[in-house]
């Protein structure tokens, strides 16, 4: 941090007592079970396919590859931390003596709601992930019943399945992937069938005892460098923020129908607790107002609109993100620093020249990590906004004050 930023940062600290601090929920889940794609994959695809995911992935928080498609922690990592739960071990990773006592992660990068096909990045579709969970639960209960206390340290007790939290963040690959072979109208027409499959999966989880369900909607897909590079070469197809309009239109319709389905499911199963979380609005707000949000205003649940109202908008602009769409790790330079032929950390010969997709100097200035996934700094911001409860339906009940802590 340079001298100017340091001075302005301490001005914020001096006046911190004047800020309005949001309240946070007192989470009391003994366990968590997660389903999804790369947004929350903590190593399942890497273990399942036997592939490598090297540095600079994981360079910030783990100092080594964490098997996450990110420079550090994901949204789910921050949420687990707030719930006083450990980071979730991936279901398919058997090395390192994984502990599943407080939950398990079934999410795998590239996964879809619809069944996988021969061209899918991941074979672990939503339905298959649920089947893995059912086997996990059955096998864990069997081991605990047969071996007594031998596995108590590593496997969930039976009541953790009914009391635990079931988190789901999947669907972006169904929508974004469809644009490679379908028109916008065809993509929009396919959404009901996608959600029918999703609803069937929810019912399977309910039948297995899942009662506390979080459903994250999909983010602004048109703002990912991968989609801009492929579908945004015609500037007339971009919105005011430089995002592909068609992709965001599809994401909005998907989310609208997903929200309606979530409400219907809640009505059908009144003993369930279904929470719909509007990730699209959080990420869209971040991209549209990137200079107002940054690495020093993520963990604290500060009402950032209040900061601006009391005259600190200039300080926010200095401390905020600097690159809303450009990838930190990639090749090609501005405006996107993305080339679909090479992924973050790889070295390849492109157009007769050997190039390496390297990370930027300071990933905390970027929202996008590799053209597809978000940086740790952006993920921390997203998780902090989730925890305000303002983006959930129903909103989190305010049960306890959130004690302000600042990370340097």
Swiss-Prot record:
EC number: 3.1.1.-
GO CC list: extracellular region
Domain of life: Eukaryota
GO biological process assignments: lipid catabolic process
Signal peptide: 1-24
Main subcellular location: secreted
Glycosylation site positions: 273, 289, 361
Disulfide bridge partners, by residue number: none
Active-site residue numbers: 38, 370, 373
Entry's localization field: Secreted
GO MF entries: hydrolase activity, acting on ester bonds
Keywords for the protein's UniProt record, in alphabetical order: Glycoprotein, Hydrolase, Lipid degradation, Lipid metabolism, Secreted, Signal
Assigned protein family: Belongs to the 'GDSL' lipolytic enzyme family.
Protein name: GDSL esterase/lipase At1g54790
Species classification: Eukaryota, Viridiplantae, Streptophyta, Embryophyta, Tracheophyta
């Amino acid at each position: 941090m340079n001298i100017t930023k340091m001075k302005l940062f301490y001005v914020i600290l001096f006046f911190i007592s004047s800020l309005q601090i949001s309240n946070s929920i007192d989470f009391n889940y003994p366990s968590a079970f997660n389903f999804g794609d790369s947004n929350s994959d903590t190593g399942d695809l890497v273990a399942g396919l036997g592939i490598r995911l090297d540095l600079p992935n994981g360079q910030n928080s783990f100092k080594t590859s964490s098997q996450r498609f990110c420079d550090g922690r994901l949204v789910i990592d921050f949420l687990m931390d707030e719930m006083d739960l450990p980071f979730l071990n991936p279901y398919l990773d058997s090395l390192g003596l994984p502990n599943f006592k407080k939950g398990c992660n079934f999410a795998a990068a590239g996964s879809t709601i619809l069944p996988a096909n021969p061209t899918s990045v991941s074979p672990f579709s939503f339905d298959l992930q649920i089947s893995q969970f059912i086997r996990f639960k059955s096998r864990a209960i069997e081991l605990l019943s047969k071996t007594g206390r031998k596995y108590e340290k590593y496997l969930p007790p039976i009541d953790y399945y009914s009391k635990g939290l079931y988190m789901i963040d999947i669907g972006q690959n169904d929508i974004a992937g469809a644009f490679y072979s379908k028109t916008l109208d065809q993509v929009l027409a396919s959404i009901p069938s996608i959600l029918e499959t999703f609803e069937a999966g929810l019912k399977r989880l309910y039948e297995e005892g899942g009662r506390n369900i979080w459903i994250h909607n999909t983010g602004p897909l048109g703002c990912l460098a991968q989609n801009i590079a492929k579908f945004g070469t015609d500037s007339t197809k971009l919105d005011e923020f430089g995002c592909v309009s068609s992709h965001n239109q599809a994401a909005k319709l998907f989310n609208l129908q997903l929200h309606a389905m979530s409400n219907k499911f809640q009505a059908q199963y009144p003993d369930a607790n279904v929470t719909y979380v509007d990730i699209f609005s959080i990420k869209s707000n971040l991209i549209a107002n990137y200079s107002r949000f940054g690495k020093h205003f993520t963990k604290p649940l500060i009402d950032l609109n209040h900061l601006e109202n009391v005259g600190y908008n200039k300080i926010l602009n200095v401390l905020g993100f600097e690159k809303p769409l450009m990838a930190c790790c990639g090749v090609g330079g501005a405006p996107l620093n993305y080339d679909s032929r090479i992924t973050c950390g790889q070295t390849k010969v492109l157009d007769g020249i050997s190039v390496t997709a390297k990370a930027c100097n300071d990933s905390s200035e970027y929202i996008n990590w590799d053209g597809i996934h978000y940086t740790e700094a952006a993920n921390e911001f997203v998780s902090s906004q989730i925890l305000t409860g303002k983006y959930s339906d129903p909103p989190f009940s305010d049960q306890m004050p959130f004690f302000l802590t600042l990370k340097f």
